[in-house]
């Protein structure tokens, strides 16, 4: 494959083990420290990349307050081998933040505004709760349905509109845990998880090289016993079919194809197209459909050209309608989230976009795929998608 000099290539990807937010492995680790550790280790294993060449550290983070405030990208960068002469910015597109970080870096490379970037994101939902410091404008209800800010209710709405049953959602939830457990046992996450020290349930310091969020014992029967989490009267969305509240970080090294060639680096993949799209906030989970359609059109590809998909599992009731309308539901077991998803691994907001992108690249590498799509819904009615080609 011949690449143009300003094509954007992914050099490497790594992530932390995913930790439970309540009493989990990262309970005594700050978000900046988690981010800095990840960046440092990823640079250490890429010896051909000079940290001094990093133009910018672009880091996704949603709740930018407390330890995640005051530009956590810069805070984390200062604690790594990246020199002070490199810059840092923190971005938020809610759930799509670290994929937006990737897009921002890609756009800079494409326009000649830098050659080497470190991108990713973090969310420590155990230290900085989802609603900490949030003060929604009550006037918003004049412009969008009042429940649009309640993600679980938007999932209920989307599931109802598309005829998604409780049983279908439970089966999807079981699948996520089973596939994530299988990937763990078979070492499929080995290339992407960068071990971190943390504390086990007994308070002992240990090195974690696995996700503590996966529940292999999950069954259809155990999920069927759960009560609705958001709509007690007739609701179908439960805690077991929703993304977990977890702590984690993800990181990528991206650069221009020309710089990768000059350094003698074999990239993992090249970005073929990117897109964002908006939808009615009341069905925010539908965002991946128009975003993916737009990205595919820009890449000159059709849905059948895509070998593998990573779709962020915000809710089973949201993921299934997306797969249905993208016309890949019948190919789910061959193409979609083959290592499980956020129902098993969790959804640390600022982390997830780069996490699903990196997991996709590993799935493509392990299974020989050529084209892949990473996509996710975004609170208040957006979608974001990236089309990758393996090189």
UniProtKB/Swiss-Prot annotation:
<dbReference type="GO" id="GO:0010124">
    <property type="term" value="P:phenylacetate catabolic process"/>
</dbReference>
<dbReference type="InterPro" id="IPR020616">
    <property type="entry name" value="Thiolase_N"/>
</dbReference>
<keyword id="KW-0443">Lipid metabolism</keyword>
<dbReference type="GO" id="GO:0003988">
    <property type="term" value="F:acetyl-CoA C-acyltransferase activity"/>
</dbReference>
<dbReference type="InterPro" id="IPR020615">
    <property type="entry name" value="Thiolase_acyl_enz_int_AS"/>
</dbReference>
<dbReference type="Pfam" id="PF00108">
    <property type="entry name" value="Thiolase_N"/>
</dbReference>
<protein>
    <recommendedName>
        <fullName>3-ketoacyl-CoA thiolase</fullName>
        <ecNumber>2.3.1.16</ecNumber>
    </recommendedName>
</protein>
<dbReference type="InterPro" id="IPR002155">
    <property type="entry name" value="Thiolase"/>
</dbReference>
<dbReference type="InterPro" id="IPR016039">
    <property type="entry name" value="Thiolase-like"/>
</dbReference>
<comment type="function">
    <text>Catalyzes the final step of fatty acid oxidation in which acetyl-CoA is released and the CoA ester of a fatty acid two carbons shorter is formed.</text>
</comment>
<keyword id="KW-0012">Acyltransferase</keyword>
<dbReference type="GO" id="GO:0006635">
    <property type="term" value="P:fatty acid beta-oxidation"/>
</dbReference>
<feature type="active site" description="Acyl-thioester intermediate">
    <location>
        <position position="95"/>
    </location>
</feature>
<comment type="subunit">
    <text>Heterotetramer of two alpha chains (FadB) and two beta chains (FadA).</text>
</comment>
<comment type="pathway">
    <text>Lipid metabolism; fatty acid beta-oxidation.</text>
</comment>
<keyword id="KW-0276">Fatty acid metabolism</keyword>
<dbReference type="InterPro" id="IPR050215">
    <property type="entry name" value="Thiolase-like_sf_Thiolase"/>
</dbReference>
<dbReference type="InterPro" id="IPR020617">
    <property type="entry name" value="Thiolase_C"/>
</dbReference>
<keyword id="KW-0442">Lipid degradation</keyword>
<dbReference type="Pfam" id="PF02803">
    <property type="entry name" value="Thiolase_C"/>
</dbReference>
<feature type="active site" description="Proton acceptor">
    <location>
        <position position="377"/>
    </location>
</feature>
<dbReference type="InterPro" id="IPR020610">
    <property type="entry name" value="Thiolase_AS"/>
</dbReference>
<dbReference type="InterPro" id="IPR020613">
    <property type="entry name" value="Thiolase_CS"/>
</dbReference>
<comment type="similarity">
    <text>Belongs to the thiolase-like superfamily. Thiolase family.</text>
</comment>
<keyword id="KW-0808">Transferase</keyword>
<dbReference type="InterPro" id="IPR012805">
    <property type="entry name" value="FadA"/>
</dbReference>
<dbReference type="GO" id="GO:0005737">
    <property type="term" value="C:cytoplasm"/>
</dbReference>
<feature type="active site" description="Proton acceptor">
    <location>
        <position position="347"/>
    </location>
</feature>
<keyword id="KW-0963">Cytoplasm</keyword>
């Amino acid at each position: 494959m011949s690449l143009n000099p300003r094509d954007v290539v992914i050099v490497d990807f790594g992530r932390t083990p995913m930790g439970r937010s309540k009493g989990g492995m990262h309970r005594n680790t700050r978000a900046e420290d988690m981010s800095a550790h990840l960046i440092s280790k990823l640079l250490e294993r890429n010896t051909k990349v000079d940290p001094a060449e990093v133009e910018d550290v672009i880091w996704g983070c949603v709740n930018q307050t407390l330890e995640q405030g005051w530009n956590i990208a810069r805070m984390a960068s200062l604690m790594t081998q990246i020199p002070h002469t490199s810059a840092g910015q923190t971005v938020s597109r809610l759930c799509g933040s670290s994929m937006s970080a990737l897009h921002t870096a890609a756009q800079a490379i494409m326009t000649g505004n830098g050659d080497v970037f470190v991108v990713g994101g973090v969310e420590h939902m155990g230290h900085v709760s989802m609603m900490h410091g949030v003060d929604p404008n009550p006037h918003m209800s004049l412009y969008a349905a009042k429940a649009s800010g309640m993600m679980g209710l938007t999932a209920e709405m989307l599931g109802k509109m598309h005829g998604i049953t409780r049983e279908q959602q439970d089966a999807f939830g079981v699948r996520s845990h089973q596939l994530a457990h299988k990937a763990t046992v078979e070492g499929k996450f080995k290339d992407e998880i960068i071990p971190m020290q943390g504390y086990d349930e007994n308070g002992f310091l240990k090195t974690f090289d696995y996700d503590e969020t996966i529940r292999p014992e999950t069954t259809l029967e155990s999920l069927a016993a759960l009560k609705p989490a958001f709509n007690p009267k007739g609701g179908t969305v439960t805690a077991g079919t929703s993304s977990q509240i977890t702590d984690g970080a993800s990181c990528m090294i991206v650069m221009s194809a020309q710089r990768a060639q000059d350094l003698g680096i074999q990239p993992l993949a090249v970005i073929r197209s990117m897109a964002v799209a908006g939808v009615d906030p009341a069905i925010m989970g539908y965002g991946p459909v128009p975003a993916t359609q737009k990205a595919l059109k820009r890449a000159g590809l059709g849905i059948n050209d895509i070998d593998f998909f990573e779709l962020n599992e915000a809710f089973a009731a949201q993921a299934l309608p997306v797969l249905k309308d993208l016309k890949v539901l019948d190919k789910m077991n061959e193409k979609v989230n083959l290592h499980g998803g956020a129902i098993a691994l969790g959804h640390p907001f600022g982390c997830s976009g780069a996490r699903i992108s990196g997991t996709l690249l590993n799935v493509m590498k392990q299974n020989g795929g050529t084209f892949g799509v990473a996509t996710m819904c975004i609170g208040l009615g957006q979608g974001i998608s990236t089309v990758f080609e393996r090189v």
